[in-house]
Amino acid sequence: MVRGVANFVIVLVALAFGGGRAIDADEIEVVVSIKPVHSLVAGVMEGVGRPALLVTGTGSEHSYSLRPSQARLLDEADVVFWVGETMETFLIKSLQALASDAEVVELWKVPGLTLLATREGGMWEAHEHGDGLADAAHGEGEHVEEHEEEHAEEHEGEHAEEHEGEGEHADADHEAAEDHAHGETDMHVWLDPTNAKVLVEAIVSVVGNADPQNASTYQANAARLQEQLAELDRSMEDRLATVSDRPYVVFHDAYQYFEHRYGVNAVGAITINPTVRPSAQRLREIHERLEHLDAACVFAEPQFEPALVDTLIEGTSANKGVLDPLGADLDAGPDQYFRLMSNLAEALADCLGGAKSG
């Protein structure tokens, strides 16, 4: 019965993305937007080929600039995986201009994902709750929704313009970044290992259809990944159990799926748009609220001005930590996703369980 359900899901994924197309070349050319997704794709393709990664180093998925060599990768791609247009905002026009012949898979639309609604304005911005921000932080469970077919049609036909100059790219990226902050669905879907398992099913279906001669290898790799993801989920649940009630604040509201899965107590975010630096007035307001909420930790991100956190925690009892939803400092490859998620759990457990340093 379980095998039958799994096969049915694979068929649904294949139908959702047009059934794929078989590639004649010995090795398919697969391009992936960000490291966590690249890691899952690399795990499925291990022993057959190596997918190319676009956002490297500590680059932001919201404002990354493609190099000419990466533009060529898109032009030559058979398959492109990305999360979606309100996440990798830099890719919107490039995919239309350069990857029109590729099978482009927008992963947030994969059937079977648990999706969470974006928390409007971020927890700190919920003025209607006054100082009851901790209550706002625990409302995310109300927004769980199963993915349905209408999501696959929400963004069709919105971007018909051709690839043009850098100025127009900047405007498009800025507008899409605003959409990221205010869109209906939180796009950080990979930060729940149960969603990662669904993504693996989609990935193996797509690459198997594109490269049927290696489909059995992809399936074997995917089965191994599913076991590893289940073990990762269990170990993270155990690691976080003793600190799940301690309040903390993050740099931007990227971790809702992680919070929902493991029941940890995030009570605020410094910003809803990580590309825009908070004003001095806002930083003062947040500093006051940190004291009011008695937050145990404030977490920076390596991509976005970690020094801000030093300013915010000065004179409070909060510890400083670093969380990275992309694993930007980790080497790309099949192990990256597992190290990313383990690092998130370790960083939370260490900071929330520690005493004030300095």
Task: Provide a role label for each language-model segment.
Residues 3, 7-18:
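Bacterial N-terminal signal peptides
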